[in-house]
């Protein structure tokens, strides 16, 4: 019963962003992934067809990241395969977001960010939250270039070095470098975790 209730609460939280059927399936996937640090394809309690669709969505939304990668540790360099034995992990901030959702039935991105950054000075936490909220109005497809991020930080009165905020957010699973965009354009691009912005109050 407890497991069923947990899935129901997760599905309720996800329903603000996903259709009811997708929210239910994704809730089952997330619930399975929350039980251990890593999860294997065969541990996901879905039909093969649903598993394929949900894994694809989970990767696109950065809920689950394949352990297998090409060159760097960035999210976009990961290799998604659907074969048995493939291992996935959940970024730290996403794990905190969905652990809380499993208990409350709602998404609280600010609480997840504050929790994952709790070992940092209070000023950095406060300004990181402010920066992440403001960026939702400036990035495209949850991606932004470093110069834009610096301009946004300056424009919103953030005094903590934006490079320190970015470095901290990368370690916490809040952001990831975009290696392909950086290589092609000669600029530093970063991806923000999409699920944080499913919470409409995170702004």
Residue spans of the language-model regions?
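Non-catalytic, well-ordered alpha-helical scaffold segments
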Residues: 24-27, 52, 56, 91, ...
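Short, Lys/Arg-rich nucleic-acid/phosphate-binding segment
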Residues: 68-78, 179-187
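Short amphipathic alpha-helical interaction segments
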Residues: 45-67, 155-172
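Alpha-helical oligomerization segments
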Residues: 167, 171-203
